[in-house]
Amino acid sequence: MDEIFNQLQEICGKEHVTNEKVDLLCYRRDCGPTPGGIPGYVCRPESTEEVVKLVKLANRLKKPLFLWGRATTFVDNGVVNGSIVLALDLMKGFEMDLQNQVVHAETGTIWHAIDGELKKSGWELAAPGGGGMFSASVGGTIAYNAVPHGITEYGVTGDHVVSLEVVLPDGTVVHTGSAANDANGNIAIERGANGADLAGLFIGSCGTLGVITKATMRIRRIPEVEDFLFYTFEKLEDTVDAVSALQSQASATFIIGLFGGPKPSGIKGNYTLHMIIRDRRTTAKERKQACEVICQSYNGIAQDPIATQRYWTEHMYSWLRNDGPSTYYGSRPYYCPEVAGFLPTQALKEAIPALNRYIQDTQEAWDQHGMRVKGFDVYFSRNSGFLWVDTLYNESNVEAHAYGLKVRADISELLFSKWMSPGGIVAGIAPYIMPKLGTSFQLMQALKDSLDPNHILNPGVLMLAGDPTFGKIPERVKPTGLELEKTGDLTYQCLRCGFCFDVSWVGKNYALCPSYEYGSFESYVGRGRVATARAILEGELEYDEKVAERIFSCTLCGSCSEHCFKFIDLRSVYQKMREDMAARGLTPTGLKQVAVDTYQQRNPYAKGQADRFNWLKDKSRLDRTAKTAFFVGCTPSYVRRSSASESVRLLDKLGVDYTIASEEWCCAHPLMSAGERSKAAEFMHHNLETYKKLGVERMVFLCPGCQMTFSNELPEVLGESMPFETLNLVELVAEEIKSGRIELAGMPAGTVLTYHDPCTLGRQLEIYEAPRTIINAFPGARFNEMPRNRRDAFCCGAGSYVRYDFPELTDMAGMERWKEALGTGATMLLTTCTSCLTEFQQVKTQTKDKLEVVDLISLVNKQVRVKEVAAL
């Protein structure tokens, strides 16, 4: 019996503690490529009280405790074998205090969740923005004192922290700030008012001295104006002198420079400056003019500032160096080992040439190992620059990785021996720079020994309590008949950025992945599933029931792929894993039976083929020659026959000349979901041939899942292009509305509509506006969008037949989406997917809420008024 495991469960609950290998492999490293050991346990506490108990337990057992926020840094420091990982992402509550101009947040809150809510009231976090805000946690960002992109006027993260709640290694809870010892509930106003700046002790200490559980941070009003400038320069000296002048006159709010790496296409000049001006309207105009005068006086070349605007508002898409999102990282598998620190602005005149000389001198070795420069980016503060030196190499190449670490050491020695001071110290470069700090490093070690004598918190980070844990880069093993190998390269493209976890920019901490909300651990979300796939390819893990649970509990909603920074087709990775597991008999029982019924009966409901069109009154529509075919689908044909009937009546009203094939089989979506690719191919081929015989040129679909299978999956499975145009019925209706040939009757007074974007219609087919064109055409009705809409829409939980094996997941997801719909004040919830419709009607029976659930096409059929019949 594992007594530690039992004690951890007593503290956090059984659902928030794991020691399963498939889970543990997802918590061994951050965005860096160097794996550490495999932890023994992962815990997800929900409160400071639970953190205290966990820390005390680890201290008593002298068990290493590694802190896990969102793990989006490039610390490149792995955990110790058998350690406890403290995943703090469930502690994500926050409270805005606009009167006192602060926000109180728990450690796991995502920065952008706070900022998204603040913006609704005209406020923003005082800490400047940047790409990391989309996915980084409050506690982690403060612990590492992250240096954001806009530090010129606003400073670094720690400059805006008012107070902290910290759990020390012995379990003592410390509150810093002016209200630290106040028993009346007053908030902290000043950080160092009680004497020593205790908050500063933990800011930047990388979790080695205590666990940050809560933080109070400053906020500010959003400026009236945000303007942008983009200049390039031929000479390094001119660029640096321009920056010094901009800094001395405080003319730009933020200054960001590029001094190496790829340049935007079609841009003249060797060096780049991006300037952001944020201020009152009149002052912003003056500051912008001052920036222009300075840049021009140093021979700057004005460029289109749209690149700067995109850099600032959409930084993680790397617009600076691209014509479109993601192309900059498109050649990954690559890892970016960072060497970063502060240096005097004028020192760039020496440091940049020195870096270039080093690269030139070692170019042959760089080429041999496929290395290249990502960039020499500089975020300028008031009087210095924060230089990032990033190099890229093939992450899956063991020799390239070893050489990459040597380059990191060389560059660290080059910069820190003369110009650079530590900033954003992380474990990746700590071995090369911490000894250079001399007595400062000794003092940090003394503090560590005093506060954490058992060295339980993040041992090895910052070279405190031992060396960093760097595991070997495992070589990919030779696959033995794995379908997964066909998408193997995709698993190495994952940047581990964490964009697949939530849609924090919507506000509040809104979830993105229903299976992650259900499964609790990273192995249930995109980043973790990719880590699982990679472990299988590298021979660290084998397919088994535990892996199957984590892959087949996915609804294939596509949210992770849609929000992936790298635009990785994660669904294709999951699909190959499903095919591998189907071949090994690991398909879950319920889905397996669905696949059997589908293959035997031509539908997933085990109904007879002869009953497929019992609902169709006008049988003359069957098997007639026509250019348009209506593909009904299994769910409308057997389960939601009213939707099928309403659809054909609507087609008749619109004057569409269409046919329905009596030999229509299931589209094959259930078979694909079950990993039965070859059987799915049979169905796809049959349906194609059936409609070819009827002279079809266009297929109209009611079910978006069927349409997605034909449009997206069929070409890949059969290796041939789709011979017909595909169109959803909502697209057809929307076009008729826009043409003026039809109109919709008015709705009763007080009708408020909201709409759920089905995953297949939205993210898979990118049909977002057609349903909204229809909804906005109902006179007398008000349309209130749910906060998560279009590409951000939360799955109802019914996708890929998940309910058959994971009913709790479906119920959870459906209920969450239902509550979001209720929050809009709607009287009617509309959707365009019969599976979603069924799920919401089941939720309605449980809640007894008055919110109606209505199929949009059925509503259109009832309300449509045809003014002109066109030949369709």
Regions found by a protein language model. Name each.
Residues 1-33, 57-65, 70, 297-316, ...:
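N-terminal accessory segments
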Residues 22-24, 28-92, 105, 125:
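Glycine-rich N-terminal segment of FAD-binding domains in flavoprotein oxidoreductases
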Residues 93-96, 107, 112, 116-248:
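FAD-binding subdomain of flavoenzyme oxidoreductases
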Residues 231-232, 240-410, 414, 425-426:
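C-terminal substrate-recognition/cap domain of FAD-linked oxidoreductases
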Residues 424, 428-481:
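Activity-critical C-terminal alpha-helical subdomain
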Residues 485-488, 530-718, 736:
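Iron-sulfur-cluster electron-transfer modules
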Residues 487-519, 523-526, 544, 548-568, ...:
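Cysteine-centered iron-sulfur cluster-binding motifs in ferredoxin-type domains/subunits
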Residues 567, 635-728, 760-777, 782-872:
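Cofactor-cradling patches in redox/metallo enzymes
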